[in-house]
């Protein structure tokens, strides 16, 4: 029996998540992973590397709870929010019996984590405005244990209607966990569902330090939920999910000074986003620019595959969304520095496109 034959059947047929780094490229303008464009500096203060770290570092948990406006017992820290997705599926879904549900176009790790665990994936296509199709979701709920909703949604950038989220939570009460993925919530903090935890025992909120906190390389995420859910997740998480240096830097990032710095970065990103959107809307090859509540912009572009390759050859790396449902011709552009945004605009202006009267 070959090594391939020894592997689980669902792993043999699995298509791995195509992360921005896995797709590669040799550019000098990286606008494909929704990262903060400049490095932030921290000095390590914890020097106890000879000892195992805390399973759930107290200082990190307490600071994040204070920042998010929840109780420490409602916080779990993990190796990025991606681990939170995996833990929820492992804790709540029986392989071969239960299902998860999500609404494409959306983040790809929901399906990868479910398929890796042998859990069925059900999809309900988002509406034309990339909102929830609630009647269609209601028809698919039998056997669903976890529902993933990304808000703001990646890659489209819009918020999910809060009244629709309430309807979904009522629809799923006693049937399924509803997970609100808030990886980008710092760019629109008024829209968080963290304050709803007291109303909905089956609500879970995912957060990360990868985006607005500019710590994508740290791999530190958070799951916010009621204590009953957190206790179940603690049963399936690895004993030491965060290394001592990661916990040290995370705690610094969540200090009052760290949060102030994060908010200053967000303000700069939002200003740069306005510049990028305005420039894109004046560019002939750009057919449509969609409103965004995040640190990235989705645009529909004439001959998008050729444009993507042209910019790639110029060292400008974007994220091609052509294979996502309803996103034919779309590229996702991370908001970089002001100079990087201008390079994108200038490069796109050199591409053939439509007359201004034909664009939307």
UniProtKB/Swiss-Prot annotation:
Reaction catalysed by this chain?
L-histidinol phosphate + 2-oxoglutarate = 3-(imidazol-4-yl)-2-oxopropyl phosphate + L-glutamate
- The transmembrane residues are none
Modified positions (N6-(pyridoxal phosphate)lysine) are: 211
Entry GO MF terms: histidinol-phosphate transaminase activity; pyridoxal phosphate binding
Keywords for this protein: Amino-acid biosynthesis, Aminotransferase, Histidine biosynthesis, Pyridoxal phosphate, Transferase
Q: EC number(s) of the enzyme? A: 2.6.1.9
What cofactor(s) does the depicted protein rely on?
pyridoxal 5'-phosphate
| Record-annotated disulphide pairs | none
| GO BP | L-histidine biosynthetic process
Q: Which Pfam families match?
A: Aminotran_1_2 (PF00155)
Which Gene3D superfamilies has this protein been placed in?
Aspartate Aminotransferase, domain 1, Type I PLP-dependent aspartate aminotransferase-like (Major domain)
Q: Which InterPro entries match?
A: Aminotrans_II_pyridoxalP_BS, Aminotransferase_I/II_large, HisP_aminotrans, PyrdxlP-dep_Trfase, PyrdxlP-dep_Trfase_major, PyrdxlP-dep_Trfase_small
Q: In which pathway does it act?
A: Amino-acid biosynthesis; L-histidine biosynthesis; L-histidine from 5-phospho-alpha-D-ribose 1-diphosphate: step 7/9
| The family this protein is said to belong to | Belongs to the class-II pyridoxal-phosphate-dependent aminotransferase family. Histidinol-phosphate aminotransferase subfamily.
Task: List, alphabetically, the NCBIfam families matched.
Answer: hisC
Oligomer status and interactors: Homodimer.
Check the record and name the HAMAP family matching this protein: HisC_aminotrans_2 (MF_01023)
Q: What is this protein called?
A: Histidinol-phosphate aminotransferase
State which gene encodes it.
Answer: hisC
């Amino acid at each position: 029996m070959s090594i391939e034959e020894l592997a689980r059947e669902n792993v043999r047929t699995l298509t791995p998540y195509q992360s921005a780094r896995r797709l590669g490229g040799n550019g000098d303008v990286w606008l494909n992973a929704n990262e903060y464009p400049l490095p932030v500096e921290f000095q390590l203060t914890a020097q106890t590397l000879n000892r195992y770290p805390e399973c759930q570092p107290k200082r990190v948990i307490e600071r994040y709870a204070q920042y998010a406006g929840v109780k420490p017992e409602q916080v779990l820290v993990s190796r990025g929010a991606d681990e939170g997705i995996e833990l929820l599926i492992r804790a709540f879904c029986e392989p071969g019996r239960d299902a998860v549900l999500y609404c494409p176009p959306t983040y790809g790790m929901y399906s990868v984590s479910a398929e890796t665990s042998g859990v069925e994936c059900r999809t309900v296509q988002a509406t034309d405005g990339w909102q929830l199709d609630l009647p269609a979701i209601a028809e698919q709920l039998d056997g669903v244990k976890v529902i993933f909703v990304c808000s703001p949604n990646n890659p489209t950038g819009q918020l999910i209607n809060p009244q629709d989220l309430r309807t979904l939570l009522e629809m799923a009460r006693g049937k399924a966990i509803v997970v609100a993925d808030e990886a980008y919530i710092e760019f629109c903090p008024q829209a968080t569902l963290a304050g709803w935890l007291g109303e909905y025992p089956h609500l879970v909120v995912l957060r990360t330090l990868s985006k607005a906190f500019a710590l994508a390389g740290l791999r530190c995420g958070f799951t916010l939920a009621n204590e009953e859910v957190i206790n179940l997740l603690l049963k399936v998480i690895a004993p030491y999910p965060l290394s001592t240096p990661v916990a040290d830097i995370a705690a610094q990032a969540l200090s009052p000074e760290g949060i102030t710095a994060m908010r200053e970065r967000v303000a700069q990103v939002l200003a740069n986003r306005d510049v990028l959107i305005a420039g894109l809307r004046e560019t002939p090859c750009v057919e449509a620019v969609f409103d965004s509540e995040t640190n990235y912009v989705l645009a529909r572009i004439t001959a998008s595959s050729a444009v993507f390759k042209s910019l790639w050859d110029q060292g400008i790396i974007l994220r091609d969304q052509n294979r996502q449902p309803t996103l034919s011709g779309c590229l996702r552009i991370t908001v970089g520095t002001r100079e990087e945004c201008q390079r994108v605009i200038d490069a796109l202006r050199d591409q053939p496109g439509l007359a201004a009267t034909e664009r939307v």
